[in-house]
Amino acid sequence: MIELDINASDKSLSHRAVIFSLLAQKPCFVRNFLMGEDCLSSLEIAQNLGAKVENTAKNSFKITPPTTIKEPNKILNCNNSGTSMRLYSGLLSAQKGLFVLSGDNSLNARPMKRIIEPLKAFGAKILGREDNHFAPLAIVGGPLKACDYESPIASAQVKSAFILSALQAQGISAYKESELSRNHTEIMLKSLGANIQNQDGVLKISPLEKPLESFDFTIANDPSSAFFLALACAITPKSRLLLKNVLLNPTRIEAFEVLKKMGAHIEYVIQSKDLEVIGDIYIEHAPLKAISIDQNIASLIDEIPALSIAMLFAKGKSMVRNAKDLRAKESDRIKAVVSNFKALGIECEEFEDGFYIEGLGDASQLKQHFSKIKPPIIKSFNDHRIAMSFAVLTLALPLEIDNLECANISFPTFQLWLNLFKKRSLNGN
């Protein structure tokens, strides 16, 4: 059996630890921070807003928040990070000053009206390009009044932006979403003294009566990153894998549950429940069967490209529906998945809200199919999750990815761990 502690810290928790520290009064400590490009954007923005960041150990920081958030003399660059842009928009909407948030071409083409509308409901002064649809965003922070908002989409980023504004508004605010999204923001903020109550699926958020408590967080491994190694095990005959120290929040392991329904043997071993549930995940290869996915999409939206690879190894038609938000990620992930599969000669079809794939079965059947075609260069579309998903497919097929380096956005050591898995699985370890 292969045992891996992938040291790929959770991206969601790393972002939030940095951003929430700005609402504290005393120094905060973040250990095992994800040194990926997205999270480093959040860290740099915190510094531009007046936070003092000191290295305390490898991938660990002491963050001393400013007495008051500083108005920056330059644009706050979120690079490719939608989490940075959306959560900072919520935080800064109530802070005195002018703040401009921008990103790379990919981020500036992603939908931002979904956060502008709820923030405007507080009375926030926020503008975006093309009638508030896109970044750059300009925010003139000021006093906010509590509001009630029902989000048409289930999005942890939208919810988090709302909560960060609500904590600084006058009065109790309410937020409802169509489906439960990641709940790290609620868990972390409540542990730091925020009054956030869930009443029959409606979040009631009271304004902060005092700064958030200082904290010392150690970030566990990211289940979204760990899933790529779980996928590698699921498609590699006779392989067994133990992934150590992984965040097991129920809103983050839905993709593992789908893989289990497809036939993979998966078990969880809980190690702690202090703040978030953390533990180990055991995966054992087994023949996969086709599946249709149309529920709990918000809890597995990031893993759907990787699940499409599992679907390729399952005989028969697999389908994904109700996942239109895949088109609003770093790339149009529906189009990216389908176009790459078509280039590989796989029967598939694109829908507005998903796709279907005609799976070929196990690795031997895939190799027989691909022996008849010239392998194309897989297009990553500069999207880390597309690149890593198809990189896992290279365990079974000799394929080239056009830009695997974009994995550095969320999983800088991805290639190292994938190569290690390949080496150990070949050796039978």
Swiss-Prot record:
Positions annotated as active site in the UniProt record: D302
MF GO annotations: 3-phosphoshikimate 1-carboxyvinyltransferase activity
Chain positions recorded as phosphoenolpyruvate binding sites: K11, G82, R110, Q157, R333, R385
Gene transcribed to yield this protein: aroA
EC numbers on record: 2.5.1.19
A Pfam family assignment: EPSP_synthase
GO terms under biological process: amino acid biosynthetic process; aromatic amino acid family biosynthetic process; chorismate biosynthetic process
Quaternary context: Monomer.
First and last residue of the signal peptide: none
InterPro entries reported for this sequence: Enolpyruvate_Tfrase_dom (IPR001986), Enolpyruvate_Tfrase_sf (IPR036968), EPSP_synthase (IPR006264), EPSP_synthase_CS (IPR023193), RNA3'P_cycl/enolpyr_Trfase_a/b (IPR013792)
Protein name: 3-phosphoshikimate 1-carboxyvinyltransferase
